[in-house]
Amino acid sequence: MQLFHLCLIISCSCPTVQASKLCLGWLWGMDIDPYKEFGASVELLSFLPSDFFPSVRDLLDTASALYREALESPEHCSPHHTALRQATLCWGELMNLATWVGSNLADPASRDLVVNYVNVNMGLKFRQLLWFHISCLTFGRETVLEYLVSFGVWIRTPPAYRPPNAPILSTLPETTVVRRRGRSPRRRTPSPRRRRSQSPRRRRSKSRESQC
C-alpha cells in the first residue's frame, strides 16, 4: 500500500497525488510495532546493524528448510509460524508489485527510486521480521529477547568498558551481558539420609507397595 501511494506521487499528476501524500504520511506516522505482542520492540531490533541480518532470500530458504511442514500446515502451530506465513505472503506480493512498477514506469529515475525504496526500507524491515521469528522458533523467545537486551547494552557501552566481541545468540547462556532478573535457583546438595531402624515386617510391606 505504501509502495502504491509512492508510485502515484512519483508518476502521476492527477488530483489524487495530494491525497496519496496525505495517506502515505499517515501510514508512516502510525505507531504500529509488530514486535509488541512478542515482548520486543522496533527499538530493540534497531540496535542490531543492518548488515547483521541475512538477505530476505536466505531467510526464506532457512524458514522453509527448518519449518516448511509447519508453515504449510493448515493447523495453527504458534504465533511465530503465523507471523512467518504472513511475512512470506506479503514479501511475495511486494515483489510482484515492484516488478510491475519497474516494468510500467518509463522514467528511469522514478524506477530507480522505487526499487531503492523497496530494497533499502521495506527490505530491511522484512529481514528484521523474518530473522526475529525464525530465531524465536529456533532458540526460544526468551533467549532471543535476552540476546536483544544484551546486545543493546553491549553496543551502547564505551569500547573501553565492554568485551571485545559482541554477544552471539547461539552461545548466549555462556556469554550474555545481562541476566534475567530474579533469583537463580540454588543447587541443593543432597543431605545424607538418616538411617531408621525398621522392623523386618515394615520393610517387607514397603517393598510390596513399591512393586504395585
UniProtKB/Swiss-Prot annotation:
Q: Give the main localization category.
A: secreted
Q: Where is this region: Disordered?
A: 165-212
Give UniProt keywords alphabetically: Disulfide bond, Host nucleus, Host-virus interaction, Repeat, Secreted, Signal, Viral immunoevasion
Give the Basic residues compositional bias ranges: 178-206
Q: Which Pfam families match?
A: Hep_core_N (PF08290), Hepatitis_core (PF00906)
Q: Which InterPro entries does the entry link to?
A: Hepatitis_B_virus_capsid_N, Hepatitis_core, Viral_capsid_core_dom_sf_HBV
Q: Which residues form a coiled coil?
A: none
- Family matches, as HAMAP family: HBV_HBEAG
Q: What is this protein called?
A: External core antigen
